[in-house]
Amino acid sequence: MRYRIILLRDNQRPGPPSLIEAIYNNRLAIRDQGHEIFGVFGSLLGLATNEVYLVTYGETELALQLPDSITTVSDRAFMPTVRPTTHEPASSPGVYVFRWFSVNPSTVQEIANLSAAAWPDFESSFDTRVQGLFAEDQTAPETMLLITWYRNLTVWEASRHPPQNARDNFLRRHKLTLNALPIATSLLSADGHNLVSHR
């Protein structure tokens, strides 16, 4: 299963309402093209207020029909590594952190293994759940993406001090990455309907 991480920007307005409306208007076309919406995520920290991430999953290419005021800043395809093993929309309110890693392609599998070893202790210690760890869909991926759900920003801050086993694995993982960029977001909806649950 391929995940698309699409960064959209409204060039005329400072917030996300028009972006949400545009995605809402594309929801049936997205499904007709063989994709489901994993989530639409707006800024908390690190993303501009007039930008959102649209995350979909499917095996085909995807084209959106957007108004002239909205720009597709980036559209990148990623493949799951050790998570997710099943594919369903995000649904829990809270904080979703997109942590972008620059990596050497030769370290992708080891990074995935270290992450999987750390997560059980990490998740049992905090109100958090790893949504997925992805590698860019290329022969030699140089970018990985970790999406983690936290109940709130307080939990995210507390999770910086994980149990020893998780800490050790995270430190080993950190040494394998070239840099990391965390972006905190929240799950958005439109017209009172959760965009990720139109079934």
Give, region by region, the residue ranges found by the protein language model.
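An amphipathic, aromatic/His-enriched active-site/gating alpha helix that lines ligand/cofactor pockets
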Residues: 15-51, 55-83, 117-131, 137, ...
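Surface-exposed interaction/gating patches
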Residues: 2-13, 82-153, 192-197
